[in-house]
């Protein structure tokens, strides 16, 4: 099966990357995440190779002063496979940048099964357990990118009527964009992080071309 990947680069004057915020979703780190690799045809021989390459890419793109927003499903979680989600969350220790995790359905599954349904207990684990390195864990969030407000939430629903949404959840199957926002899933950007400039480029294309094309073809 062939794939179409978007491969965005953010290069400042002199070739130096200066972006401070990055976005991704649906990484599904974890010791038993091989089914995700197979289902999405991710081009890695096993979960160890996949994880190693993702860590390399993230640390190459984002500096220790930058912030990566992971918009859900950082980890994989299946009932009765507790080590799966814990090993997935532990990948955060290998990342140099700050990480803000937005809860996805896999994190919610871990909350329901292993943390008595308590978001706060899960958040405390992510922030304080020695195996993890997260700066914050949130149900959703807002960010301002060059004067434009964006709502960050895992599932692709038109939650915020006053701004665009950055989401994940559908992997590559839902496409790159919806009328209400953009899919920043890892499968949509050749396994690289989306930058602020990438988001603004897509917003410009959406306003200039994509919305009009949708109106013509609807």
Give the ranges of each region predicted by the language model.
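Intrinsic disorder/low-complexity segments
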Residues: 11-13, 63, 216
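Short, Lys/Arg-enriched N-terminal segments with co-localized hydrophobic residues
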Residues: 1-18
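Core catalytic region of metal-dependent phosphoesterases/phosphodiesterases
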Residues: 24, 29-139
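Hydrophobic/aromatic beta-strand patches that form the interior of the parallel beta-sheet core
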Residues: 22, 69, 100, 166, ...
């Amino acid at each position: 099966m062939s794939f179409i990947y978007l491969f965005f680069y953010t290069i400042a004057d002199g070739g130096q990357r200066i972006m401070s915020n990055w976005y991704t979703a649906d990484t599904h780190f974890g010791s038993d995440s091989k089914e995700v690799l197979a289902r999405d045809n991710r081009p890695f021989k096993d979960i160890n190779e996949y994880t190693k390459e993702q860590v390399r890419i993230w640390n190459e793109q984002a500096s220790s002063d930058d912030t990566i927003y992971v918009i859900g499903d950082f980890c994989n979680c299946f009932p009765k496979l507790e080590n799966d989600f814990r090993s997935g969350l532990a990948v955060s220790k290998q990342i140099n940048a700050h990480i803000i995790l937005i809860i996805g359905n896999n994190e919610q599954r871990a909350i329901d099964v292993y943390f008595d349904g308590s978001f706060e207990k899960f958040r405390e684990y992510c922030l304080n357990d020695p195996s993890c390195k997260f700066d914050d864990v949130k149900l959703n969030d807002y960010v301002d990118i060059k004067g434009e407000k964006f709502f960050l939430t895992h599932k692709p629903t038109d939650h915020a009527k006053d701004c665009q949404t950055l989401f994940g959840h559908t992997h590559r199957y839902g496409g790159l964009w919806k009328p209400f926002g953009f899919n920043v899933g890892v499968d949509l950007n050749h396994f690289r992080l989306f930058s602020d400039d990438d988001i603004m480029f897509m917003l410009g294309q959406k306003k200039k071309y994509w919305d009009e094309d949708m109106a013509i073809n609807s």
